[in-house]
Amino acid sequence: MYEFVLNGKKISFEENMNLLEYLREEANLTSVKNGCGEGACGACMVLINGVQGRACINTLEKINGKEVQTVEGLSEFEKQVFSWSFSKVGAVQCGFCIPGMVISAKGLFNRNLNPSKDEIKAAIKGNVCRCTGYVKIIEAIELSAQIFRQGKLNFDLERNGSIGKSLTRIDAMDKILGTAIYVDDMKIDGLAYGSALRTKYPRALVKKINIDKALNHPNVITILTAKDIPGNRYIGHISKDWPALIAVGEETRYVGDAIALVAAKSKKALKEILQLIEVEYEELVPLTKPEVAMRYDAPRIHPEGNIYRSERVRRGNIEDALKNSKYIVTNSYSTPFTEHAFLEPESALAMPDGDGVLVYTGSQGIYDEQREISELLGLPKKKIRCISKYVGGGFGGKEDMSVQHHAALLAYIIKMPVKITLSRKESIMIHPKRHAMEIKVTTACDEEGKLTAFIANIVADTGAYASLGGPVLQRACTHAAGPYRCNNVDITGTAVYTNNPPAGAFRGFGVTQSVFAGECNLNLLAEKVGISSWEIRYRNAVEPGDILTNGQIADSGTAIKETLLALKDKYYDNEIVGIACCMKNSGIGVGLPDIGRCNLVIKDGVINVRTSAACIGQGIGTIMTQIICEITGLSPNKVAIGFPDTFDSPNSGTTTASRQTLFTGEAVRIATMKFMEEVMKQYSEENLINHTKESCIERSIIRKWLLNNTDKVLNLLNDREFYGEYRGITDPINSPKENPVSHVAYGYATQLAILDKNGKLKEIVAAHDVGRAINPINVEGQIEGGVVMSLGYALTEDYPLNNCIPIAKFGTLGLFRAPAVPNILPIIIEKNTSDLAYGAKGIGEITSIPTAPAIQGAYYMLDHKFRTTLPLEDTFYKK
């Protein structure tokens, strides 16, 4: 018998079990999260006798006779303080890590109620946040300490929902207190547990699968193999090359390949059953690198060959340009695979729904899931309903199928609810990564430093399956030359299949890699010309009316020069400083369907927003709320954002390509204008005005009337729906037009990295052209989070493979933690006058792109060693 106190209540429990498992499964506490299972992420942080402890590496035996406290056990005043502070400063994004952060803050305050910033950083060293960059979390803890010292709280959270105001995130409170429900938090009666048996080898012929012993386990429900799939066995986000289950007689392509699916009555039984399945393999030599896979005699990973996709971007006369150039620089660069390391491992819960399936998920696009599940099950799409719960981070890593299709298949076959949640080890092994790339770049200029030619050859390791390797390669090529005037470019790209884990979407979408190479080359060119790295960028930066690398004409909202000017003084005032610029598209573009959609449904005195746009931490729900409030003048509490649901949420596309604020935001603006047109009719009828003749009634008059008659108007319009749709019209990548429109908008950025004489980062200055900041604190948080993610990419992160097998654990990925984060100064540049979504451009990806080359430039200035490989070697952070 084990006895302890949990949140002030005495507990007695006979079985010794993992503390995290007890808290989640027996005590039904949802604030403690299973982020890694190895004591490395801090999402399961609790207080044990008032001191921080990780629940995932403790047992009931270890805490016998002790007191355990979770967020649920805080006093009401403590909950108010933490909720207010974290909301106030914008410290919450995806929210998965936040309860653990709160507990670490509480543990710190138990011993020190007046901590320094360094002491706060040390206190949360064991907590990983992948979204915020820690900056605003540290501010929230500082503010909380101040309030606790004062002993009182003034409730003054921002409730003005207008554009340009830092409205408190609509979901912040639930995430802070741990009441926000992610998929793995869901409990359903009669739930079965599912998992896949994965191959032992990255490349092997599956000769036999024997499930007889496993079927004799008393707690087995079913075991499925490839022959049990009723529909199309091959799935894929774009290319259908990824088998949901590997069949007998088929080769495995990477260690994440699933051989069999098991449904069991308990998690414990699930592990036992998986071990009883016998698979006979013929191990084959894996193709470890693109250079190996591209050999003429290399075995084919897929029937079409090992070259998945090729791209070319060519303009001008590159040969003549090189002949006439004064200075030429050529270098080769290497960037690694990297892991998204979102804090919430993949999870899905599926159940029978009539003659179809209902799937609860936490991904970046419910309609993509619906389509792929319907193909797998051989059912019409209308038979598959997908509902998103809260999503604990994505960064591109939750665009592909991981567990959703397997959960749906099991639930459909056994007619029971089934949950599949990946362990962190499985997550690191299975989902697509950032592409490793080998990039050779030649950059040329005239005697004044004006760019004359840019040549690049990019080889991307797309791993075992296509995922989004094609579009990633395309974006790497179209953005490689940067936001500069250069009339002569020749960029080629090749995506190659290997037996490594698949590579796909990752924040920056290929641009992070190609810009690293291009920007580093530019510094050497400046050196040859005899001008500064800032000056060569300013001389070549595009202005409105200039032609971009892809032929598109830069629009009036182009503000790369403004970002350069914003940090010019910082650049010249510091001795050891690196600089880098970039551009990044908003929207999928290149002639593909790119649509934002929403329905505004008036119900019970509230405007309900229904859209499939996934919030993965970026705060799209808050943005939509502010757009509605801007137009109507209503309070944010009159707006409710629903969870994405294929049953009643219009398809607004995947949360990818930094598109949702612009595309879904514009759809919401259009729908809200339709709503206001109806309000105007109501006003006209009440005031005996002929609406058709008096269509120019001042908007301010209508807004004021609506505010004075809110409940009355909303009741009159009860059950009315107002649909909004925005279609981004663009040209295909191979358009014959001289100046095609590849994307509806581009954001621009310049970042500085400032080092001290020991090579330690002092500050990152990040100036970003965001068009219009709908919510400034939200924009700052995106900048800070993107910067810190790329601090790791530049300096410490890696995803090592041993013969195609991942060998990293969560704790060894090299993720940046709070104590290492330097000062980050976000500078918001607003120039865009476009009506689309009030001029907002996407900010989610571009924040992580220029950081690595800026840091490389700073180290080159420090020691004159020109580093061409990431993570950078021989630095303060990696010797």
List where the protein language model places each region.
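C-terminal catalytic domains of large/alpha subunits in multi-subunit enzymes
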Residues: A226-K227, G378-K383, I413-V418, V472-C582, ...
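Thiamine diphosphate
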Residues: Y390, G394-K415, K419-I420, I620, ...
